């Protein structure tokens, strides 16, 4: 099953081959502008950045790839280990001739962004990250909020194929849960959810959570992250998030030279809810790091 790529006025679309992945890339703004690499999360795709893509801030070239196996990108040649995905996206930067970028990430795109930041800090001028835990966690910080993971992640990791392809789970539960003011609009939720009826996309999402629960969380508990970030990080966080507690992005536990945390009256899907604020913070980061 397939779905049409949702239209966004004025964008350029291409397919770029990198590290065995056929990336679907959507971009806008001047081709010689300062590059901004924007990474989406689950259960979404590049369309979450439609506001920035339709009206890129002056001087910025906004580049929003679909992550491996998501959206309209080809499948990942692995089981979605986040370090593998980080390497895939770094290879995409190489293929597109992007030496340094401003990085933007939300949800799993935020997680992958942190892996990239720590692996190759010289390639990033700054990082705007939204509603994702920073990587400097310990069992003490995670355990009080582990129940949040158990509320949905085991289901996606185990029966995610059927759940995403054959039920309204994404629209009604993931996008429709919580206070009405913070829910994704039904029409927008449908644009995201329809793509996850494709078996490649549903499998990629299932692998995302299965690998996280079975491999990456146990590994992180045994070997906590010790690398320090030298890249300026600006964490924007919707405080009504059910999936990720804001304490997991606390500046007090961030091992970073320059890290700020901004609470926002929004839910998990802060880009959909507050595109104006995301745009403003990107412009501020670009000016700050020029």
Give residue spans per PLM region:
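Flexible "cap/lid" subdomain of the alpha/beta-hydrolase fold that forms the substrate-access gate
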Residues: 2-14, 21-23, 28-30, 35, ...
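Short strand-coil-strand connectors
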Residues: 17-19, 40
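Structural cue for short, hydrophobic secondary-structure segments
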Residues: 38-41, 64
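Active-site glycine-rich loops that stabilize anionic/oxyanionic intermediates
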Residues: 41-44, 107
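Conserved catalytic core of two-component sensor histidine kinases
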Residues: 43, 50, 279
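Short amphipathic alpha-helix adjacent to the substrate-entry channel of hydrolases
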Residues: 47-61
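Catalytic histidine-centered segment of alpha/beta-hydrolase-like enzymes
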Residues: 266-279
């Amino acid at each position: 099953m397939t779905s049409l790529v949702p239209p966004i006025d004025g964008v350029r679309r291409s397919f770029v081959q990198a590290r065995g992945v056929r990336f679907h890339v959507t971009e806008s703004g001047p081709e010689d502008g300062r590059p901004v690499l924007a990474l989406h999360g689950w259960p979404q795709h590049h369309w979450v950045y439609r506001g920035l893509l339709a009206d890129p801030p002056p001087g910025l070239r906004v580049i929003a790839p679909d992550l491996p196996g998501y959206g309209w990108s080809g499948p990942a040649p692995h089981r979605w280990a986040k370090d593998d995905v980080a390497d895939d996206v770094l290879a995409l930067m190489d293929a597109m001739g992007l030496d340094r970028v401003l990085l933007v990430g939300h949800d799993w795109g935020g997680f992958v962004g942190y892996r990239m930041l720590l692996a190759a800090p010289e390639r990033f001028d700054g990082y705007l990250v939204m509603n994702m835990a920073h990587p400097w966690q310990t069992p003490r910080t995670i355990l009080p909020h582990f129940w949040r993971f158990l509320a949905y992640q085991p289901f996606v990791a185990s029966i995610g194929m059927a759940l995403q392809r054959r039920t309204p789970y994404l629209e009604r539960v993931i996008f429709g849960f919580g206070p009405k003011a913070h829910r994704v609009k039904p029409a927008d939720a449908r644009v995201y959810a329809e793509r996850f009826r494709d078996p490649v996309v549903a499998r990629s999402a299932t692998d995302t959570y299965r690998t996280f629960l079975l491999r990456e969380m146990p590994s992180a508990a045994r070997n906590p992250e010790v690398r320090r970030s030298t890249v300026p990080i600006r964490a924007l966080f919707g405080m009504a998030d059910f999936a990720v507690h804001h304490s997991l992005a606390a500046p007090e536990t961030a091992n970073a030279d320059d890290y700020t945390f901004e609470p926002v009256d929004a839910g998990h899907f802060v880009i959909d809810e507050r595109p104006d604020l995301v745009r403003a913070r990107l412009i501020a980061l670009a000016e700050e790091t020029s």
